[in-house]
Structure formats: C-alpha cells, structure tokens
C-alpha cells in the first residue's frame, strides 16, 4: 500500500488536493472553480476520481459541492488494504467523510456527516470501522448556543448493506465516557445537562455504571438553589425521555433503582 499526499496552489482552474494509491486503485480529490455564463468569480467545488492504478481505467467519478480536506483530517487517506477515506467540507463548515471499499472488483461507498467537528476514521479491535460524530441543533427552540451530542457510527458491511449506523454497545461505551468527562470539565452541569445525559445513556452498555454520575448531576443542579431535589430529578427525567425519543437508548431504571 502506497500513500501519496500532496497539496498545491491553485493552478489554472484546478487545485490539486490529494491522492492515495491502495490495493490496485488510485483515489484523487481535486478542488476546482466551476463557472457559468455571466459568473464573475465562479464557485469552488470538488471532484473525486477513482481509477485502476494498473491501466488508469476510470471506475468511478463524482462531482461534489464538497471541497477537499477537513482541517487535521486529510482529504484522502488509505485506512488499510480494504478501505480508503475521503473528507471534504462546505466552505469550512459541515464536514463529510466518504468511505470507499476497494477489494478485488467490488467497489462500494458510504458517507457520514460530521457536521462541524471532523475526526479520523478508526479501525476497531475487531477490524470494523468507526467514527465519532458530534451532532448539534437537535433541539431547536429549546437550547441556545452550540450543544454537541455524541454518537459513534460504525460501518456495517454485509450482504444487506454498506453504510454507517449509530452504535451504543459495550465496545464503544468508553468513547461516550470520554465525551462525558470532557464536557463535565468544560462547563457547569446546568449549562450542558442534555449532552451529559446523552453521553450517559449511550454508555449504559459498558462495564461502568452510570448511577453515581446521575446522583452527582442531581446534586450539582441543586447548587445555588436553582433546583430543589425534586426539581433536579424532574428536569433530568424530562431530558432522558427527550433524548430517547431522538434515538439514544432508553434509561434502564432497573440498573439504577430510585435514581430518577
């Protein structure tokens, strides 16, 4: 597997962004200026090409509004001898990763949006691919300011589908705990309660119990006497139900009896 990654300045109407050669294929992600009659400046867009390295035969091509590169995540990456990843953005925001399966003559592609927080694709211990996504604006009108809700997406690759699905099993629980701890340290509980509870719901399948953290959050909400004990637990219970309604696991009341 040979990785070639290059960056260049705008040359003519095209900027070369990156190229990867892996498992007999070459993937290239370019940035170019697209113009139409009457345009003064044109629009910056992207172009993706996949060719067989041996004979340079084109096997797949896509024109996309995505522009190559995602900050610290390269525009094109060879993950292993089966997968390549392409990452692009819409004018510096809303990042999207595309995963290409390149084994033998079989080619498949799956996409996952990472919104405004790009991160690399990970290879799990069992060989599957996973990626962390921080979703925002899940409760418009209820929450002000940026609130980031974590979801680990795992690539499902079988006869039924090739695509990313949310994962909340025990193998990814630690990823949710990492987000919980980082959020806990960044702001008071009352300011980030929904995303804290989302992380705890997502981590329920792990080995570590969430019960003690629920008690701590309830106590923190009572500091400054903004909430009494009943008010704090009512608020937490309300958000637990709302989070379950948008796809997070339901709260296991039997695992933490009497907490909420």
What is each stretch, according to the model?
Residues 86-91, 134-136:
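Beta-strand C-termini and the immediately following turn/loop, strongest in propeller blades
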Residues 68-75, 115-123:
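Repeated scaffold domains used in trafficking and secretory/extracellular systems
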Residues 48-62, 98-113, 151-165:
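Surface-exposed loop/turn elements that mediate protein-protein interactions on large endomembrane-trafficking
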Residues 16-32, 37, 128-260:
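Acidic, small-residue rich beta-repeat scaffolds with periodic aromatic anchors
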Residues 3-12:
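Sec-dependent N-terminal signal peptides
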């Amino acid at each position: 597997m040979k990785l070639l990654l290059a960056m260049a300045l705008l040359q003519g109407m095209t900027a070369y962004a990156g190229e990867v050669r892996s498992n007999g294929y070459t993937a290239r992600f370019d940035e170019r200026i697209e113009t139409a009659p009457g345009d003064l400046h044109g629009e910056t867009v992207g172009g993706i090409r996949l060719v067989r390295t041996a004979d340079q035969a084109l096997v797949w091509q896509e024109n996309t509004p995505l522009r190559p590169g995602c900050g610290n995540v390269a525009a094109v990456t060879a993950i292993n001898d089966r997968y390549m990843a392409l990452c692009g953005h819409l004018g510096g925001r809303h990042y999207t990763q595309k995963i290409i399966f390149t084994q033998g003559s079989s080619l498949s592609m799956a996409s996952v949006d990472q919104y405004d927080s790009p991160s690399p694709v990970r290879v799990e211990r069992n060989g599957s691919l996973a990626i962390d996504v921080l979703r925002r604006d899940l409760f418009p009108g209820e929450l002000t300011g940026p609130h980031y809700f974590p979801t680990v997406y795992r690539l499902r690759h079988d006869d039924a589908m090739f695509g990313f699905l949310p994962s909340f099993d025990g193998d990814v629980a630690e990823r949710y705990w990492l987000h919980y701890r980082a959020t806990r340290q960044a702001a008071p509980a009352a300011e980030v309660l929904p995303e804290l509870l989302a992380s705890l719901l997502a981590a329920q399948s792990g080995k570590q119990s969430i019960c003690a953290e629920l008690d701590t959050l309830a106590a923190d909400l009572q500091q400054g006497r903004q909430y009494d004990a009943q008010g704090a637990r009512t608020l937490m219970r309300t958000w637990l139900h709302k989070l379950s309604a948008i796809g997070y696991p339901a709260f296991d009341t039997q695992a933490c009896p009497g907490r909420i």
